[in-house]
Each structure stands twice: as structure tokens, then as C-alpha cells.
């Protein structure tokens, strides 16, 4: 399919009223999920678990509609409550929360919304320009190159897993081991399947694994804490100044356009490198702004609006840019992208060269859906912030059972099997212990999703190429060098981000807790 033809097809799909409603509905769910800390990824998992039964075009629009606004509404708890809405909004607290205490919450939120919109739009446009070029490049690759890229992708994600490299590698190995259970695709024989458990012949269900590893542990955390996220302020106090100064904040974004540009560029560059993403970019951009902006060393941490603009410009750009390696190479950069990769596989798409050659119209549908969702989300936040902000005060007694019921229904309907529910409980307990003891969960999901893909490329490679040919192919050598450079640079960025977070947390007294009440810092890619 030609590029112009794909653009027209993508626009034609988006022009359908059902698709527009899907984007709008996804945006509303995304805004609500982002406004409540720890529920962004579970919310996406719930929606995606239900969307796989829809028409693929509608399902993609719904998922992308939800993906974009999450990175905007997670600013609400960061600014109003001093609690990070997600891993990518931690640095926003440092100046956003002091602004709220000074009666400038609306100004901080207005700046954050526009900065996030700019970042999301720029990254979406970048996808539109990069994917046609990527199609030409990946078509010169063969099985050895994709095998190497897949292995390197898993390794990079594991290496930068919150400083726990060994745990990350072990988690990725567990994920690939789980993916190996079932029927051998080459021989057609059972593999690691007890005779008494024929359920496992089809392998472990992706939806079950994702819900059990990510979604249920977060809901269990809310239930065990047995309180709303915000306990030190009332809803009335939190939203009192939420509508004041929004337009002033947006004007400040335009005044600091060079800061926005630098932050967006940094966000995009971080986004296209697997494994770091949202867990790093907010601290890097905040530290960069603090070091380069005039007077920032003295004013950051006291309510300087530039300290809100910098990380918010970058996080949405990073989230969208992470779709580039996910769609072009089939290598997810973090937890969110691993879920999206699994989602595309369940819809019958195969991210990678085949996807770019056969489904370029879907690529442009993704681009247009992201653009529309960013606009929808920003407009709704500008006028409905006070309603979304109240979500953070919902009691777990009300919220958790509802989400839990939806998750269980989604798990059961995936195959209409009670075995799925039983296995879900086992995986959820395992996921809860990973969360509790600080084991990174994204590498496990990425290993699980990439396991069958790597196995397929490995089989083809061993049949068609000798070990020496695999290593000495020019394309392979280039990929190995680039992958090693990315791994080194990713680890370096992760260390710098950790150092920046520690330095800023100890040198800037914001009066807020450094840690989220959830495990937001653990999850990357959001």
C-alpha cells in the first residue's frame, strides 16, 4: 500500500462516527484512569481486554484514544495532592505542588495541559514521518537481524529496570519461559505441559498474564491500603483554585517555547530507546531545565512554572515515541508498549516489517487517533478538571470492587474458561509478590510477548544461516553496535535520572512525600 493511499485510508477510517466515538470514549476513560494514581495501566488493560472483541479499526481507535490523555490527566494528583499520578509525573510535583499551595493550581495545570498537548502532537506527527522511512529500512533486514534486535530489546529493558539488572534479566527469563509452555510450533508436540493439564496445550493466555502481573496487584494494593489516595486535604481544598489562571499558564508555555522544544526533543529521543521511557524522562528534562534556564537553580522547587512545563512537555512525547520501535520493529520499550504489542497481536496484526508493509493504513489511523485524542483530552481537562480531580478521593471500597469485577469478566470472556480464572489467581499472587519485593514487572511481560517471536526468528535463522554468517552479516554487525550503544546510553540515562531524582528530592523542600503510595516508579513506558 502506498503512503498517500494509506493516509487516505486512515483518514477514511477515522471519519466514521463509530471510530470518532471510540476515540472520545477512550479519551474519557484515559483521563479518569490517569487522574487516579496507580490505575493508568490497569485501566488500559481493562479497556484493551474488552476491545479485542471489537472490529479492529474501532479497537485501535479506542486504545489510542485512551493512550494519549493518560499522560495529561496524571498531572492532576501531582499538582493538587503532591502524589505522582504515574511514573512520568513525579518531577512535576516539585514545582507543581508548591504552585497549588500558593493558589496557582490552575496556572500550573493550564501550562501542563498545553505542554503535554504539544509533546503528544509533535510525537504523533513524527510517527507519520518516521514509519514510511522505517518501512524502507526494515525491509533490508532478515531473520538474524530481527533475532538480534529482539534479544537486545529484552536485555536493554532488563538492564535499566530500576537499577535491578539481575532481577530484570531473571524476570525477562521467566516471561520467556512462560511463553514456551504449550505446543511446540515447529514439531506440534506438547512442551512443558503435564498430561493432567490439557488447558496448557494452547499456552498461557496473554490477557491473563497481563492482568495478573500488572492490574490485579495494583487493585490489591488499593484494597490493602484501604483508603483513598488523598487523605491530607479535602476535595474542596484541592480544587479550590483549579479553574483560576489556566490561560495564564498556557501563555507561559508559549513564552518558554525553546524550553518546550528542547524538552520535546529529549522526550522523543528517550522514547525511541527501549527500556527507559517514562521512568527517566521527567527527571532528565527537569534537571536539564534547572541547569540551563536563567535563574532556575534558585527558583526551581519554589513554584517555578518552568519546572512544570519541562517534564510535561516531554512525558507525552515519550509515550507516543515509544510506539515507533513497538510498531516498526516489534520491540516494546516498556510495560505500556508490551501491552499494546500484545493487543495488536490479539487483533491479528504482526508489528514489524509485515505490519509496515501490509497495514500502513493502521499506522496512520494510530497517528490520527493520537492527534484527535490529545485534542479531546486537553479540551476536556481545561473545562472539566474539577470533576476529574475528585476521582482521587474515591474510596477503594467503591472503586476496587468495580475494577476487580471488570477485570475478572475480561479474563473469563477471553476463552470462556474457568481454568483462566484459576490461573489468573496464581499469576496475581506472583505479580503481587514481585510488586511487594521490588522485582521489575515490565521485563517479564516483554519477555512473555517477545518469546514466541524470538523463537520463530531463531528457528528461521538456524535453518538458513550458519552462526558465522549471522554475526558477519553487515546488517547484523550494524545492529549489534547500535544495540550495544543504546544499552550503554540507556543505562547511563537511567543512572543520571536516578541521581537527579535523589539530588532534587534532597535539595528541594516541597513538603511532599518523595514516594508514591503505589509502585508507580517501577513501571516504565507510561
Task: Give the ranges of each region predicted by the language model.
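A structural-propensity feature for long, helix-poor, extended segments
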Residues: 69-79, 86, 304-329, 333, ...
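Membrane-embedded alpha-helical modules
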Residues: 110-227, 346-498
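Transmembrane alpha-helix interface/packing and boundary motifs in multi-pass membrane proteins
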Residues: 27-41, 70-82, 157-162, 264-276, ...
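Short helix-coil transition sites and intra-membrane helix breaks within transmembrane domains
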Residues: 32-42, 79-90, 122-126, 270-283, ...
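Helix-loop-helix hairpins and the membrane-proximal interhelical loops
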Residues: 1-57, 135-139, 193-304, 389, ...
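Re-entrant/interfacial helical elements at transmembrane boundaries that shape
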Residues: 41-51, 78-98, 129, 172-173, ...
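Membrane-interface alpha-helices at helix entry/exit sites of multi-pass transporters
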Residues: 57-61, 98-115, 294-307, 335-338, ...
Amino acid at each position: 500500500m502506498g503512503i498517500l493511499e494509506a493516509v487516505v485510508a486512515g483518514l477514511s477510517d477515522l471519519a466514521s462516527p463509530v471510530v470518532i466515538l471510540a476515540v472520545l470514549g477512550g479519551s474519557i476513560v484515559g483521563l479518569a484512569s490517569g487522574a487516579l494514581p496507580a490505575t493508568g495501566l490497569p485501566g488500559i488493560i481493562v479497556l484493551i481486554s474488552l476491545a479485542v472483541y471489537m472490529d479492529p479499526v474501532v479497537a485501535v481507535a479506542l486504545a489510542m484514544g485512551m493512550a494519549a490523555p493518560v499522560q495529561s490527566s496524571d498531572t492532576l494528583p501531582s499538582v493538587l495532592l503532591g502524589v505522582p499520578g504515574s511514573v512520568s509525573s513525579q518531577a512535576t510535583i516539585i514545582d507543581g505542588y508548591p504552585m497549588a499551595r500558593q493558589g496557582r493550581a490552575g496556572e500550573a495545570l493550564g501550562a501542563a495541559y498545553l505542554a503535554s498537548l504539544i509533546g503528544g502532537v509533535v510525537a504523533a506527527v513524527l510517527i507519520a514521518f518516521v514509519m514510511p522511512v522505517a518501512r524502507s529500512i526494515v525491509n533490508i533486514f532478515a531473520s538474524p537481524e530481527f533475532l538480534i534486535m529482539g534479544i537486545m530489546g529484552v536485555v536493554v529493558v532488563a538492564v535499566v529496570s530500576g537499577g535491578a539488572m539481575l532481577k530484570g534479566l531473571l524476570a525477562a527469563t521467566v516471561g520467556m519461559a512462560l511463553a514456551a509452555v504449550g505446543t511446540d510450533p515447529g514439531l506440534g508436540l506438547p512442551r512443558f505441559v503435564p498430561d493432567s493439564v490439557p488447558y496448557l496445550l494452547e499456552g498461557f493466555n496473554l490477557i491473563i498474564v497481563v492482568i495478573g502481573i500488572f492490574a490485579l496487584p495494583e487493585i490489591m494494593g488499593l484494597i490493602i491500603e484501604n483508603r483513598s489516595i488523598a487523605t491530607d486535604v479535602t476535595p474542596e481544598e484541592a480544587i479550590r483554585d483549579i479553574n483560576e489562571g489556566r490561560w495564564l499558564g498556557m501563555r507561559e508555555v508559549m513564552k518558554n517555547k525553546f524550553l518546550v522544544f528542547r524538552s520535546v526533543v529529549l522526550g522523543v529521543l528517550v522514547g525511541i530507546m527501549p527500556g527507559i521511557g517514562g521512568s527517566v524522562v521527567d527527571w532528565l528534562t527537569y534537571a536539564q531545565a534547572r541547569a540551563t534556564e536563567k535563574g532556575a537553580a534558585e527558583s526551581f522547587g519554589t513554584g517555578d512554572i518552568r519546572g512544570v512545563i519541562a517534564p510535561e512537555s516531554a512525558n507525552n512525547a515519550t509515550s507516543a515515541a515509544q510506539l515507533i520501535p513497538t510498531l516498526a520493529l516489534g520491540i516494546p520499550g516498556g510495560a505500556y508498549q508490551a501491552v499494546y504489542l500484545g493487543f495488536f497481536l490479539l487483533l491479528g496484526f504482526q508489528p514489524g516489517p509485515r505490519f509496515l508493509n501490509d497495514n500502513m493504513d493502521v499506522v496512520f489511523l494510530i497517528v490520527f487517533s493520537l492527534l484527535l485524542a490529545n485534542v479531546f483530552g486537553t479540551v476536556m481537562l481545561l473545562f472539566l478538571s474539577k470533576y476529574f480531580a475528585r476521582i482521587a478521593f474515591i474510596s477503594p471500597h467503591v472503586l476496587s470492587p468495580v475494577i476487580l469485577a471488570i477485570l475478572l469478566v475480561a479474563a473469563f470472556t477471553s476463552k470462556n474458561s474457568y481454568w483462566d480464572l484459576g490461573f489468573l489467581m496464581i499469576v496475581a499472587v506472583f505479580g503481587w509478590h514481585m510488586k511487594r519485593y521490588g522485582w521489575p514487572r515490565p521485563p517479564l511481560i516483554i519477555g512473555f510477548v517477545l518469546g514466541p517471536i524470538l523463537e520463530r526468528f531463531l528457528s528461521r535463522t538456524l535453518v538458513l544461516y550458519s552462526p558465522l554468517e549471522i554475526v558477519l552479516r553487515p546488517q547484523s554487525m550494524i545492529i549489534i553496535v547500535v544495540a550495544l550503544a543504546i544499552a550503554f546510553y540507556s543505562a547511563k540515562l537511567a543512572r543520571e535520572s536516578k541521581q537527579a531524582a535523589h539530588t532534587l528530592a534532597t535539595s528541594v523542600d516541597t513538603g511532599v512525600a518523595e514516594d508514591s503510595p503505589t509502585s508507580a516508579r517501577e513501571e516504565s513506558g507510561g
